[in-house]
Amino acid sequence: MNETTTKQPLKKRSLSSYLSNVSTRREELEKISKQETSEEEDTAGKHEQRETLSEEVSDKFPENVASFRSQTTSVHQATQNNLNAKESEDLAHKNDASSHEGEVNGDSRPDDVPETNEKISQAIRAKISSSSSSPNVRNVDIQNHQPFSRDQLRAMLKEPKRKTVDDFIEEEGLGAVEEEDLSDEVLEKNTTEPENVEKDIEYSDSDKDTDDVGSDDPTAPNSPIKLGRRKLVRGDQLDATTSSMFNNESDSELSDIDDSKNIALSSSLFRGGSSPVKETNNNLSNMNSSPAQNPKRGSVSRSNDSNKSSHIAVSKRPKQKKGIYRDSGGRTRLQIACDKGKYDVVKKMIEEGGYDINDQDNAGNTALHEAALQGHIEIVELLIENGADVNIKSIEMFGDTPLIDASANGHLDVVKYLLKNGADPTIRNAKGLTAFESVDDESEFDDEEDQKILREIKKRLSIAAKKWTNRAGIHNDKSKNGNNAHTIDQPPFDNTTKAKNEKAADSPSMASNIDEKAPEEEFYWTDVTSRAGKEKLFKASKEGHLPYVGTYVENGGKIDLRSFFESVKCGHEDITSIFLAFGFPVNQTSRDNKTSALMVAVGRGHLGTVKLLLEAGADPTKRDKKGRTALYYAKNSIMGITNSEEIQLIENAINNYLKKHSEDNNDDDDDDDNNNETYKHEKKREKTQSPILASRRSATPRIEDEEDDTRMLNLADDDFNNDRDVKESTTSDSRKRLDDNENVGTQYSLDWKKRKTNALQDEEKLKSISPLSMEPHSPKKAKSVEISKIHEETAAEREARLKEEEEYRKKRLEKKRKKEQELLQKLAEDEKKRIEEQEKQKVLEMERLEKATLEKARKMEREKEMEEISYRRAVRDLYPLGLKIINFNDKLDYKRFLPLYYFVDEKNDKFVLDLQVMILLKDIDLLSKDNQPTSEKIPVDPSHLTPLWNMLKFIFLYGGSYDDKKNNMENKRYVVNFDGVDLDTKIGYELLEYKKFVSLPMAWIKWDNVVIENHAKRKEIEGNMIQISINEFARWRNDKLNKAQQPTRKQRSLKIPRELPVKFQHRMSISSVLQQTSKEPFW
């Protein structure tokens, strides 16, 4: 078929159905392949014998090769024809046998072998036999053909490789056919034109119109193509990837197994395992390092045609609404539909409502994040039109915005639209990267179109960043530390900020955040010399892992330019300081572009790093391969971050550099004037000396300094024509002097190897010349030779020079070692301070916990007291009215509750009611179990409660009598007075208080066991005791029960003779009542 033919979209089938069909087909075809194994082994053995025979014949009998080829070719053809015939006969035999068994046995076929086994076998064998016989075996005319080589002969004798069943399935596309469709026609169609099957398959309408979108649904067929490098997943989707179930051998286009593998990369994960914006490290945390991680950002006002206000969302995980479907990652169906590119479904969901368009999943990603990540521009436009926040950030662990996701994945149209609708290109994620820095390097892509897209994205982000910062007024608002609050996405990192960050790092929230970060690299001794160690150093320099870098260089590890530039680029001042302290040259440039560290540091908002480099002696006048200086990159930042203070700092550094070297040049000029004769003599001597001495002179530091001065002054003309006025006289004099010597230095530097060879030859010639041959020479030549001999270095001079060089090296090593010791001492002091601060924090934490524990104990005690009070109040509500109003603090009003009632048992022991004694003595402990033995207590019989109520009503209903002179036995006055209350109300109160009285716990106790310390009080109480009879209570109760058992009035009325008069018919009832009342006491 034509390769340009486009494939039609395929029908989407369920994953479980597809897998079951594939596994069934695999089992069937494996059984078929086993039947052919023996035949293949026999054939392979024959082929090996043929190859061996052919090699031996070719080696021993080269003259009979032609005849041997014809014989072997005919034998091979005959063997092949016999094999094909045998296979055809076997196949026909098996078909006849199977059809015969089907007629005889009916449905006796096993369940695990489908009916299409024979058809599949027939088709496969036909395909194999046709493929094995036709293409690779040719009928060759041996007589008319040219002689064969040994390789051609071996290729002719070797039988073509037979295809296995798995290869056949993979090539012919049988894995995509349903089991019920596996007929002869379909199988034959698949073996000839496998592409035709795909044309008849389309996506079902249910996938397009339904709102029930799942995480396993396929992505829309019109999704944008990702840039062809590699596919990574976002941090929250790391665990979502799944592997193929069949080792990637049988996955067809209907399978959704690898759907999760096509998730686009996220800048957070692609840029490293940890943020260059560091929290407090475990070891070396107090050094000044990268900008803080969690800046406080305010909304920046801007003017836009859409009149939409800028907003940067807080990276807190929102409260998720209940009742809305979410997958394992916390995504709603709206987010899933945006991820899959289903525009119609998204539009329908938004129109129907019920979904928060800015709802975030477990990783803090919104629907706009999903659409921007996958590059669905139509969905992005729809979401923004309906109020999606373009600057919302994911959780603090990632901190990505939709613009960062779109930029990292190369979606140019999405980037354009987001920038047009107010997306902030200066926002940094948790890795400290902006959208510009998240874009991949062009060198990682081979396609020119992809490179063009990346360049366009960077261009637009750079322009947008400049416009954004200019609108924010960055040139007018400077911070104390030099970092502009509007330009840089972090606050100034001074000592105060550092202390706050350290304090925040010790808090539980920051501690939990640190735990979520990837662990730092561990140092091994092999890292010093291995390539893996250099990669670890590069990663640590990029991510700001100070402990690893310190340990690496302390153990003698070599610092490379790549790691140094990365630490400068990311703004890690502490790591840059360590590199410089251990002797890394601050002015070393890259090999390709001649870029210096200062050029890398400027224009990125790392003002502290720029200051550090300048203090370490960075040359601000260096130029790269394009002739640009650090000042140019500071003014024309590729990230759009221009800081006026940084520009001023570099200009001052250049001015100071020029001024310093101009003074040095003036001093050199004075020395030249004072030693003019010596200088002239040196000039004359240069014309006659040997090339070696000339090369030595050209390599002196003086010439190098003069070349640097020349280059520096040229830079001054380019960068400061309009800004600074340099002294004309000093500049012109030094420039003239340098131009005179520049050509000499250049000439010797270009021809160094040639001059060295010529010089050696000249010395050998001088040595080979005899004294006789020297005599005819002119006095001028002898004088030149004499001068050259005079200036040759003697042994003493050489020893002195070597000694000076050795002393200089020692001093330099000592100075370097001293610097390293000072740095390590500083690191140790910082570590000690950090440990002290941690101990202090621990003490404060212990005090806080102790205070919190005490406060909690007090709170629990108060709650317990309130609970006890509430309990007592609840119990008090169960007391009768008279008991409530008794004052238990007054122990002298016992007379109000007399007389005291008691009864006598068989042993003549007096028993009193404990409740009345408690009221008399105001002793609550009297009712406790420990005070009175349980064996000596007699519980109150329920039948006695009514008589006791009648006796003690004056206490529990009326609250006792008044203790005054007017109160007497005949006319008692009580606390509670029901004189003004009608009879029904009074009866109701009495009934209510009686119910409370009978619920009180009461018991009879021995009067002798009651302890009263005041004998007068005891004597007075005993004088007011009244004896009652318990037996009478029992008899009265029994009579009452008997009365209840007596026939009712109606029953008795039926027994009364009707002949009696009416006034005598009820005589018996009246007499029983009279008898009962006569037995009861009248009190």
Curated annotation (Swiss-Prot):
PROSITE patterns: ANK_REP_REGION, ANK_REPEAT. InterPro entries: Ankyrin_rpt, Ankyrin_rpt-contain_sf. Residues 1-233, 267-328, 472-516, 661-742, 762-790 are annotated as: Disordered. SUPFAM superfamilies: Ankyrin repeat (SSF48403). Residues 300-310 have a biased composition (Low complexity). The modification Phosphoserine is found at S14, S16, S67, S290, S507, S698, S778. ANK repeats lie at residues 329-359, 363-392, 398-427, 532-561, 593-622. Transmembrane segments: none annotated. Residues 167-185, 665-675 have a biased composition (Acidic residues). Residues 24-62, 86-118, 151-166, 186-207, 721-740 have a biased composition (Basic and acidic residues). GO terms for biological process: cellular response to starvation; chromatin remodeling; DNA damage response; negative regulation of meiotic nuclear division. It comes from the Eukaryota. The modification Phosphothreonine is found at T37, T700. It holds the Pfam family Ank_2. Residues 67-85, 135-149, 277-293, 481-496 have a biased composition (Polar residues). GO terms for cellular component: nucleus; Set3 complex. Gene3D superfamilies: Ankyrin repeat-containing domain. Keywords: ANK repeat, Phosphoprotein, Repeat. Residues 314-323 have a biased composition (Basic residues). Identified in the Set3C complex with HOS2, HST1, SNT1, SIF2, CPR1 and SET3. Unknown. Component of the Set3C complex, which is required to repress early/middle sporulation genes during meiosis. This is Protein HOS4. It comes from Saccharomyces cerevisiae (strain ATCC 204508 / S288c) (Baker's yeast). The gene is HOS4.
